[in-house]
Amino acid sequence: MEITEFTPSRRTVCALAGAGALTAALGPARAAVAAGPTPLTDPFFSYDRPARYGVVREDIKVPLRDGSHLAAQLYRPADATGKAAVGRFPGIVYEFTAYAANLEYFGDAAAYFVRRGYNALVCQARGSGASPGTVDPFSPQEQRDNHDTIEWLARHPGCTGDIGQMGVSYGGHTSLLVAVNRPPHLKAIIPTNALHDWYENTIYRGGIYSPRIRDWQRSTAPATLQTYAAHPLYDDFWRGRSVMTRWDRLTVPTLEINGWYDRYRDGMVKNFLARPEHVWLVSGPWDHGDPATQYAGIGPGAYLAWWDRWLGGDRHAPLPAARVTSYEIPGPGAGTGWHQFDQWPPRDAHSLTLSLRRDGSLAAAPAASGEAAFEVNTGTAAPNAGQQLLFSTAELRRDVVLAGDATLTVRAAFSASDGNIAAVLHDEAPDGTRTRITAGWLKASHRHGHTEPAPVIPGTCHDLSVHIWPTHYRIAAGHRLALRVSSDDYPEIDSDVPAGRVTVGVGARGSTLRLTVRNP
């Protein structure tokens, strides 16, 4: 078979055939969507009520079952004299985290809830801040400590015994992990930008170590530089740091705050798909971190509505109007803003499969069989022309909305005994500039799972199914959907495989890209 090398400047000339949204995108032109994003009008997100209390802080030690303790700050409603108000109030573990440097920030943010009648606890995980021990992020020990913290707060004489937990990133991870441990007094959680599985989301993406986490490891938990490297396969070490392995135990009401640009969007969506009867999903136009600092439409009022409902016993406090509240990115401008759906992917979404073709195009019709090849990039620089394959659709005459995950099913032969496949989707503008939409990665020896490596026989064709993380993204008319296939995607994954060549089957009986799309 002929081997064709593709370059970044290669453009397609073929139109897309077949049914579905992309076919319509190549039909007669239609008017563009109205300028400006759809606003978030659901009353849940504008909920608020007046503050009634002041705030008093107590520096405490939370006792643990093994005789150790955790340092924490307990913020309680205060009366007019500045003393703790008489009565009992529901409790929120506002952050259970290893980020001791942020304690004052957390305390200031927690005060919003304290002034409205909640106790709020900011807790330093074992080995962080003033808590003795060694940080072992999201470990079974840390989960036991978190369980003990919730039960301690429930027994506090100023608490009703109804406890919630919330947090961003580290605190979001701990919120989900403690929930599947089922402490008796935990009633609901709000995890923001959080995991479903520490191995898959963060450390070994598709079985490939992610270098972007190493600086975090060095600064937060240096011992993990050795322990994580010692567990390249999915074993009990990782099962103990996973929500996924215990999805059946995620039974408390869960308000997931996800970002479509966030590094944990795949995990947040997977949690929802696994437990749709217990999870409400909010996915917005933000990256990793606190959404309130990136987007003015998400504030503490929505969280207060959640706590008033599940901890305060107010059955009139609103819930989100739909199970899924999602911002169609990019925006403002290209994306249409907020939408609400009863499920994810949306009910009107459907799968569309495109073929990777010899001329560098993506189309529903596969065309002739063939091969294309690229060289393995063993460095950290972006791949050059010979180290990647590029495929793209024709220019779209109508908008196309991606609403869900995607899968690259690739037939590949490796000249070495292992290899990596990185699949990156881009929005290509008429001037040729590309905007990254989403991506997925897979080590060839992990093509049958991460628990046991599968042999990679040099020169033999292997079928790999690369999961591409979900998105809710509008590709505008006049743009193209572009797919880059290579061995690297630094800093998302390490370039950790031997030098060599990867040959990819294209055209009929070759590689395909399955998309989830909805009508624009």
Q: Which residues does each predicted region cover?
A:
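N-terminal secretory signal peptides
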Residues: 1-8, 19-26
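C-terminal segment of N-terminal export signals and the immediately downstream linker at the start
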Residues: 6, 27-50, 410
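N-terminal export leaders
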Residues: 10-14
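Short, polar/charged, Gly/Pro-enriched helix-capping and turn/loop motifs at alpha-helix termini
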Residues: 20, 27-28, 160, 313-317, ...
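A short acidic/small-residue loop/turn micro-motif
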Residues: 23-24, 30, 77-78
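Short beta-strand/loop turn elements enriched in aromatics
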Residues: 36-39, 222, 374, 432
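Active-site-proximal cap/loop segments of hydrolase catalytic domains
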Residues: 41-319, 325
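C-terminal, loop-rich substrate-recognition/catalytic regions characterized by aromatic stacking residues
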Residues: 282, 291-520
